[in-house]
Amino acid sequence: MKNTKLIVKTKSKTYPIYFGNNILNKTGWLIKKNLPNVKKICIISDNKLPKLLLKKLIKSLKKYELKIYKLSASERTKSFKVANKIIEQLLNDNFNKSDCVIAMGGGVLGDLSAFISNLTKRGLKFINIPTTLLAQADASIGGKTGINSSQGKNLIGTYYQPDFILSDVSILKSLPQREIISGYGEILKHSIILDRKFFLWLFKNGKKIINEKNNIFLKKAIIKSCKIKCKVVNKDEKEKNLRMILNFGHTFAHGFEGAKNFSKKLNHGEAVLLGMMIASELSNKKKKLSLKDLLLIKKHYLNLKLPMFITKTFKKNEVKKIIYFMKKDKKNIDEKINLILLNKIGKTTLPKEFSLKSDEIRNFLNSYFL
């Protein structure tokens, strides 16, 4: 499989994303090429990754002074306590602004590592090596850093772009089916909001991605997904306007995750898939999305057995908790819950165009349990 490079151009930084098969062992060479002044490297790695992956990375970095942390990739890890502990140790080890933090894991460790990089001495170098489909296709791009609060997900954070991203597609072969489905949710989101042609390609080839983990189709879907997100981020790095459309399905998703206490009962990608289905049905109810397009989306969900029924995951008495976390969402305006809805496959409503009172959303969610 041919290696590919995509350039991200934001106002604050221009940086490359490297895609390929078995390219993890090129990390050291890429650091030398892109960041020649690095001497010390802190690796923050998912403790459940195959040991061989970390060994490969360490072997490629043998010329550098290494500090290694293996962390649990749970939402509870994204905390001030964990971030502060690592920052204090980096300061104790005299990490300088020219030194580097590498995240090796999914979106959770990417968010946390970028947060740590940004706050330590007002900015260390940062490299992201995403090891999940969700992170390769979405979470690693865009510069959002974050930790969680008891009030909700990612309510504390900054924007801090990486110096480069390395996406080794061959790593995804080891992922369980649930993780592939989770990542597919973000790929599908990018097609639904901005690219009908890509959606129709996924409609035709989704099973090759999810069931077969076909390397060629996986790479094509990841790169296309990244190109769509990059196009948006390049225009609106700090989510002042256009970038908000990337939150399609996410306001519901954050409510769903919160209602399950951000536990592994419902992971982020599953919550996004469920949130997109609810947002699509609400779009149809509000006469934004045609029944024809809604049925096409539903057919794709059914074909791939994607999470789509709120009643299979929640009970009616959990709706109140869902609304509580939706009201905490960063995108809300005044007392209303701001939503991105669909006009058609490939086009959303405008950011800040559509907001509803929490009572109306509560009634809409309750209607599923009648």
Where are these regions (language model features)?
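ATP/NTP phosphate-donor binding region
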Residues: M1-C100
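A glycine/threonine-rich phosphate-anchoring loop and its flanking beta-alpha core
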Residues: K9, Y18, F115-K207
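C-terminal charged capping/lid subdomain of soluble metabolic enzymes
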Residues: T14, K288-L370
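Glycine-rich beta-strand-to-loop/alpha-helix junction loops that act as flexible
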Residues: A73-S74, M104-G106, F248-G249
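Nucleotide-activated sugar donor-binding and catalytic core shared by glycosyltransferases
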Residues: D93, Y160-P162, Y184, K292-L295, ...
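Short glycine/serine/threonine-rich phosphate/pyrophosphate-binding segments
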Residues: V108-F115, Q136, G255
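Active-site segments that bind and position negatively charged phosphate/pyrophosphate groups
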Residues: K204-N317
